[in-house]
Amino acid sequence: MSLFDFFKTKGSAATATDRLKLILAKERTLNLPYMEEMRKEIIAVIQKYTKSSDIHFKTLDSNQSVETIEVEIILPK
């Protein structure tokens, strides 16, 4: 990453990806009660815009305090 890239604005897809990563990173120690509802809402939004029903959540990397979850979406042709 160069100095010029630092000031470059991100595209909407990159911003959405970063936001989704932040949303899906959950603190294990807190055991947030709304995570399951948030997953359902994310699935509903994805289905609204992609018409896909094949959506899976996967745990990617876990350590003592943070669990990272990946969303896999199979898009119909």
Curated annotation (Swiss-Prot):
Gene Ontology process terms (BP): cell division; regulation of division septum assembly
Family: Belongs to the MinE family.
Alphabetic keyword roster: Cell cycle, Cell division
Pfam families documented for this protein: MinE
Protein name: Cell division topological specificity factor
Superkingdom, taxonomy of origin: Bacteria
Keyword Cell division: yes
Annotated function: Prevents the cell division inhibition by proteins MinC and MinD at internal division sites while permitting inhibition at polar sites. This ensures cell division at the proper site by restricting the formation of a division septum at the midpoint of the long axis of the cell.
Gene3D superfamilies: Cell division topological specificity factor MinE
